Design a protein with these regions (language model features):
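Core dinuclear metal-dependent hydrolase active-site scaffold
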Residues: 1-54, 62, 112-162
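Cap/insert and terminal regions of metallo-dependent hydrolase folds
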Residues: 42-117
Length: 162
């Protein structure tokens, strides 16, 4: 648990959001929840080295998720934004989408991709979404989901059991 500290008292609930970090197989993931800007600033002040391969964020009610200073500290290889179609306030804004696009890393928005699942391996990870996006931790560029194996529609030859 990286945030909040026991004595933190922010007036907005989003600034007290729980922030978790884990290192799995040499890869680091950072879960920011709906952390607001004052909470992000406090986190950066306490822990300037927040480097993580994957960052998952929600959308705080006020201001935008993932300040530029926070992104500079994290240097993520993949960004997952947990947003939704409804209500409209839970959608990533065009301004946020544009700003994150400029980071030149894959950004996944759950309102478009559906659930994202990360499978950790000994020294790597693979991320898959319900929409068919697949990312490999060794080279996290968006990859199309491989086609399913072909199913034969031909009848199998009968087996004579005599």
């Amino acid at each position: 648990v990286l945030h909040p500290e026991p004595d933190d008292r922010f007036p907005q609930a989003d600034d007290n959001a729980l922030v978790l970090s884990a290192a799995i197989g040499g890869q680091r993931i950072l879960l920011l929840s709906d952390l607001g800007r004052p909470g992000q600033d406090a986190l950066l002040q306490r822990i300037p080295n927040l480097r993580a391969d994957i960052v998952v964020t929600g959308l705080p009610m006020q201001r935008e998720a993932l300040s530029d200073a926070l992104l500079d500290a994290i240097q993520p290889r993949v960004i997952i934004v947990a947003d939704s179609e409804f209500p409209a306030a839970e959608r990533a804004s065009p301004k946020l989408r544009e700003r994150l696009t400029q980071r030149k890393v894959p950004v996944l928005y759950t309102r478009s991709t559906g659930t994202a699942t990360i499978e950790w391996r000994k020294d790597n990870w693979e991320l898959r979404t319900m929409s068919g996006i697949r990312l490999d931790g060794r080279k996290p560029a968006l990859l199309p989901e491989p086609p399913p194996p072909e199913i034969s529609t031909e009848a199998e030859p009968a087996i004579d059991l005599q």
